[in-house]
């Protein structure tokens, strides 16, 4: 069978920095990005389109004096995604979005042996969670034009106290308030970290924190499609809560040439919410979003390691994380634990840069990540013009792992009387790895089957020019 995949993207960045006097700096950052993907599959006799868009703006002002540092930020962001797809003679339009606008102020100051920082934050959110419309021969289905608005306000205060040349404690309290659907939530979140410094190079730490999350990210696709949506806490969807403990070790050599860090953590999670349906369900039943949200508890644990070299001709870092993210939902099973939708068992990153001289340098990076969990359909068939589906264990399957290597050769030069410039030759995906973007259900000889869609760029060389001013 023939499949045509077309992909287009555009990204725009603008950053303006102004030093407004000896004590003030202003920075304006603007970003807009849009991606379009068309998947034409002969089995479907339909063109499936996926669009997603990000827009962000931030205005930052920093004022510093001998007594304090004040930072203020005004932010705006908007995210949208739209999916148009068809199976046989049935078509689906699915769209989601979230808009945020906010203000934050942070103040840092020192008094005696205490280093203080505190601040306030306010955010307004507007949600459009999963608007959909289905039409065709199986079923007509449509959601009302549902909107959500929410307001979040936070205030926090934190102190870094030196108890002894070898001991210090970082403690604070964050008070958050969230209002949506006529319901208000108020949550005090205490946090404390104890540091022990047996020498100037070694640090041991113990951390405990209580955290609340009012926004919930739901994954709609069972095959890795980027069609997640955001929804708000409400009387029926309580704020997520996490009790977090961590033990850490950090080594820093003389003159900060080398750094080594290790952290082991455990998080106990309450009021966890995930989306248990799939895109296929829109075609097979009279659909209500709330009927496909499951609620439960969970835990995360893992180990993070990092080795970093900061100076010398050879510099870079290696980081590795191994972890597990498990959930239990009474709607699925009162006793069985499942992988979280966002579980990532292994995550490895390597970044290396070698500077031959003041003009030439060679850099490279390698990334590896375990595949995303998803719920695989065991069978899908048509009975009396109706689609019928049967699923396996919730998040019981995984997409293949992804890995990739990139390299870049850079030449830096400064013509007499001009600013520093550089030319860059890079190769993306050096060994032409075919990573799986997502999987989808398609017809194969009158039966449904899973098919992988692979990344378009087997290997991508590029040339870049940079002018510093």
Language-model-detected regions and their locations in the chain:
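Flexible loop and strand-edge segments within Gram-negative outer membrane beta-barrel domains
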Residues: 23-100, 226
């Amino acid at each position: 069978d023939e499949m045509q995949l077309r992909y287009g993207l555009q990204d725009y960045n603008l950053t303006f920095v102004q030093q407004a006097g000896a004590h003030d700096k202003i920075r304006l950052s603007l970003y807009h990005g849009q991606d379009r993907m068309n998947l034409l599959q002969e089995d479907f006799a339909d063109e499936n389109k996926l669009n997603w868009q990000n827009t962000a703006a931030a205005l930052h002002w920093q004022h510093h004096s001998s007594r304090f540092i004040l930072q203020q930020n005004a932010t705006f962001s908007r995210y949208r995604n739209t999916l148009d797809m068809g199976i046989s003679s049935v078509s689906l339009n699915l769209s989601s979005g979230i808009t945020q606008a906010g203000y934050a102020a942070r103040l840092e100051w020192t008094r005696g042996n205490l280093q203080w920082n505190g601040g306030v934050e306010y955010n307004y959110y507007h949600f459009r969670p999963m608007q959909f419309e289905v039409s065709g021969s199986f079923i007509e289905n449509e959601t009302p034009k549902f909107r959500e608005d929410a307001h979040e306000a936070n205030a926090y205060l934190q102190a870094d106290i030196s108890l002894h040349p070898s001991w210090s404690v970082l403690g604070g309290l964050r008070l958050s308030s969230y209002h949506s659907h006529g319901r208000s939530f108020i949550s005090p979140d205490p946090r404390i970290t104890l540091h022990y410094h047996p020498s100037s190079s070694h640090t041991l730490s113990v951390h405990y924190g209580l955290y609340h999350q009012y926004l919930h990210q739901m994954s709609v696709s069972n095959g890795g499609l980027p069609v997640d949506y955001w929804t708000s806490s409400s009387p029926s969807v309580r704020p997520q809560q996490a009790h977090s403990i961590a033990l850490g070790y950090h080594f820093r050599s003389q003159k900060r040439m080398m750094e080594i860090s290790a952290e082991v953590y455990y998080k106990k999670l309450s009021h966890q919410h995930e989306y248990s349906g799939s895109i296929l369900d829109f075609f097979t039943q009279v659909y209500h979003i709330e009927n496909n949200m499951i609620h439960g508890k969970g835990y995360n644990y893992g180990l993070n390691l990092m080795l970093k070299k900061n100076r010398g001709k050879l510099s870079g870092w290696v980081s590795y994380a191994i972890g597990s993210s498990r959930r239990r939902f009474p709607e699925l099973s009162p006793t069985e634990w499942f992988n979280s939708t966002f579980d990532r068992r292994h995550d490895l990153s390597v970044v290396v840069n070698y500077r031959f001289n003041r003009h030439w340098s060679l850099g490279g990076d390698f990334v590896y990540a375990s595949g995303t969990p998803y719920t695989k359909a065991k069978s899908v068939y048509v009975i009396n013009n109706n689609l019928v589906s049967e699923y396996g264990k919730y998040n019981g399957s995984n997409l293949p792992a992804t890995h990739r290597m990139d390299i870049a050769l850079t030449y830096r030069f400064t013509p007499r009387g001009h600013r520093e410039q550089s030319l860059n030759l890079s190769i993306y995906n050096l060994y032409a790895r075919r990573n799986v973007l997502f999987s989808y259900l398609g017809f194969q000889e009158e039966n449904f089957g899973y098919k992988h869609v692979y990344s378009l760029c087997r290997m991508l060389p590029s040339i870049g020019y940079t002018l510093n001013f």
